[in-house]
């Protein structure tokens, strides 16, 4: 099994275990005020994973991070620092924002 296959297997196992929990969190906890934020994070996720060999699994993992980021930002009343911190967490390659 090569490195990419091992990585995919690891991500699949990780995602199977936590996906339903994140789905429930997203359904019940993220309000409509976060919708525009989610669109921004969706765009960042797409840009970050478009050239990845394991892009589908990477994207699934980042979507779960996105849910957590939206919850974090919402709990901090959409503060500017909380938003920048969450965006940097999801997309650490974007340095000009921080």
Swiss-Prot record:
Q: Which family does it belong to?
A: Belongs to the rotavirus A NSP6 family.
Q: How does it assemble?
A: Interacts with NSP2 and NSP5.
Query: Where is it localised?
Result: Host cytoplasm; Host mitochondrion
Give the domain of life: Viruses
What Pfam families does UniProt report for this protein, alphabetically?
Rota_NS6
Q: Which GO terms describe its cellular component?
A: host cell mitochondrion
Q: What is this protein called?
A: Non-structural protein 6
HAMAP family xref list: ROTA_NSP6
Q: Fetch the InterPro entries from UniProt.
A: Rotavirus_NSP6
Which keywords label this protein?
A: Host cytoplasm, Host mitochondrion
């Amino acid at each position: 099994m090569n490195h990419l296959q091992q990585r995919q297997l690891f991500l699949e196992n990780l995602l199977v275990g936590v996906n339903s929990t994140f789905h429930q969190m997203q359904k019940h906890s993220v309000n409509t005020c976060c919708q525009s934020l989610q669109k921004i994070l969706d765009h960042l996720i797409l840009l970050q994973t478009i050239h990845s060999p394991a892009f589908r699994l990477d994207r699934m993992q980042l979507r779960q991070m996105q849910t957590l980021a939206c919850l974090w930002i919402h709990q901090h009343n959409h503060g500017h620092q909380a938003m920048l911190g969450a965006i940097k967490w999801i997309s650490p390659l974007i340095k000009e924002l921080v």
